[in-house]
């Protein structure tokens, strides 16, 4: 095949991306490499020469969704390569789950396996002779809107929580070199990104695997450590008038060091801290650190340093052996801590998790009932805290402009998981601001999730 033919009719790869933001970053890296090697990305099964499905395998519902997506791709296209967390899962006999259910897939890899995925693509769909490296931006190909992006700083996790199997799929913590992280952040800001969302399995543990060794960025030393990285990212973001938001922050002692940076405006006053529960006995069964009293003290101290701090967390209701008293402790904690944003999952057994062997498994209806009670309390807390913002003027990042006005997010709202700010008036909204702009909005109303306001 001639070079001209390759250029005019490049091989086409379809892509299905499932799962969490960490998986989304993996998808972006694969798509970036595909484009760099001259492949084009097809938006339909019919138009693709083969399909890559990036899967999730964390909970049973995600496993089924991934298996269904693989089945659909096989039916609609027939040539499918599977990657992601589900690709690393084995059944009781030690066979990989994907191949057992869908034996016609071309190849199966685990998560964060760019090299293996590309090797499989090359085997079943040879790459063209002329790479389109000049068509790939320095920031890479992104699956998020142009004005925000995820920045993954590490892979894997050193924790062994009893309800989780991520370490068995993604391995132990491996931190990215600090200079590499900073370069990616700079390229993203140069490409117009206005909000950088820092993610990992455990952001607070960044650098522990390399003993916090010192790297270099722009000719100056920079430790591979969360505090130093966050400070450098905040300084860089300020040069572009952009936001930096932190996710998956475990409440280690050194987290206290970044709260002053938030109060100074270096990074957003927003902490995503996965607490999971409040009762010490449940936390022990979960193999999680901390206890409710110490956590409450930490939260109070953080808010004294940074009064505008928004705290998001996730919890599990109905964990094996959870008594009504233990669950009530969790409800009391939520009310007293006044967490701004929370998510709650009814416990769901995950194949391969050690929590499956714990006694006291609760019926589905009990788990769901407790989740509903939890969310009722959490929404009351959220409504109270949001009501306090009425009358304030907030800086809002615009996500969408339509005939009804603008829709955006404040510093308290991460994309997809938190609330929204609805911006009035609708008249001439598209002439006053556009997606990706920052606008000042005076808040005029609130409910349990969202805010309403007018351009100030």
UniProtKB/Swiss-Prot annotation:
Q: Which residues are in the TRAM domain? A: 387-456
- What is the required cofactor set for this protein? [4Fe-4S] cluster
Enzyme Commission code: 2.8.4.4
Judging by the UniProt lineage, the source's domain of life is Bacteria
What keywords were assigned to this record?
Answer: 4Fe-4S, Cytoplasm, Iron, Iron-sulfur, Metal-binding, S-adenosyl-L-methionine, Transferase
Report domain Radical SAM core positions: 143-384
Q: What does the UniProt cofactor note say? A: Binds 2 [4Fe-4S] clusters. One cluster is coordinated with 3 cysteines and an exchangeable S-adenosyl-L-methionine.
Which of this chain's residues are annotated to bind [4Fe-4S] cluster 2? 157, 161, 164
**Protein localization:** Cytoplasm
GO MF: 4 iron, 4 sulfur cluster binding; aspartic acid methylthiotransferase activity; metal ion binding; protein methylthiotransferase activity
GO BP annotations of the record are:
tRNA modification
The family database entries (PANTHER family) matched by this protein are listed as:
RIBOSOMAL PROTEIN S12 METHYLTHIOTRANSFERASE RIMO, RIBOSOMAL PROTEIN US12 METHYLTHIOTRANSFERASE RIMO
- Report the family membership: Belongs to the methylthiotransferase family. RimO subfamily.
Q: What is this protein called?
A: Ribosomal protein uS12 methylthiotransferase RimO
What organism does this protein naturally occur in? Cupriavidus metallidurans (strain ATCC 43123 / DSM 2839 / NBRC 102507 / CH34) (Ralstonia metallidurans)
């Amino acid at each position: 095949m001639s070079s001209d033919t390759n250029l005019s009719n490049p091989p086409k790869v379809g892509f299905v991306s499932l799962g969490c933001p960490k998986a989304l970053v993996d998808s972006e890296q694969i798509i970036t490499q595909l484009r760099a090697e001259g492949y084009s990305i097809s938006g339909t099964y019919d138009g693709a020469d083969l399909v890559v499905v990036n899967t999730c395998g964390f909970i049973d519902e995600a496993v089924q969704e991934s298996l269904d997506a693989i089945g659909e791709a096989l039916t609609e296209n027939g040539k499918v390569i599977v990657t992601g967390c589900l690709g690393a899962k084995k059944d009781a006999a030690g066979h990989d789950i994907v191949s057992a259910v869908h034996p016609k897939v071309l190849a199966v890899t685990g998560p964060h396996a760019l090299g293996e995925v590309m090797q499989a693509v090359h085997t079943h769909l040879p790459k063209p002779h002329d790479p389109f490296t000049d068509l790939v931006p320095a920031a890479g190909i992104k699956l998020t809107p142009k004005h925000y992006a995820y920045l993954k700083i590490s892979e894997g996790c050193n924790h062994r929580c009893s309800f989780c199997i991520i370490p068995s799929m993604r391995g132990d913590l491996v931190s990215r070199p600090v200079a590499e992280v900073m370069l990616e952040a700079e390229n993203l800001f140069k490409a117009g990104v206005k909000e950088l969302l820092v993610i990992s399995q455990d952001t607070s543990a960044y650098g522990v695997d390399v003993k916090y060794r010192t790297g270099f960025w722009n000719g100056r030393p920079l430790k591979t450590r969360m505090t130093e990285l966050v400070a450098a990212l905040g300084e860089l973001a300020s040069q572009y008038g952009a936001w930096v938001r932190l996710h998956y922050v475990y409440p280690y002692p050194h987290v206290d060091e970044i709260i002053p940076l938030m109060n100074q405006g270096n990074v957003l006053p927003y902490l995503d801290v996965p607490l999971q529960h409040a009762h010490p006995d449940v936390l022990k069964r979960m193999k999680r650190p901390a206890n409710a009293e110490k956590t409450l003290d930490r939260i109070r101290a953080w808010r004294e340093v940074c009064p505008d701090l928004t705290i998001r967390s996730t919890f599990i209701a109905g964990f094996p052996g959870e008594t009504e008293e233990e669950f009530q402790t969790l409800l009391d904690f939520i009310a007293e801590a006044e967490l701004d944003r929370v998510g709650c999952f009814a416990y769901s057994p995950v194949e391969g998790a050690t929590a499956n062997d714990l006694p006291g498994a609760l019926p589905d209806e009990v788990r769901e009932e407790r989740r509903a009670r939890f969310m009722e309390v959490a929404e009351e807390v959220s409504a109270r805290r949001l009501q306090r913002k009425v009358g304030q003027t907030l800086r809002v990042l615009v996500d969408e402009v339509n005939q009804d006005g603008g829709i955006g997010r404040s510093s308290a709202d991460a994309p997809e998981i938190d609330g929204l700010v609805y911006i009035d008036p609708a008249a001439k909204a598209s002439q006053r601001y556009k997606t990706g702009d920052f606008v000042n909005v005076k808040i005029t109303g609130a409910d349990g999730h969202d805010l309403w306001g007018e351009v100030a």
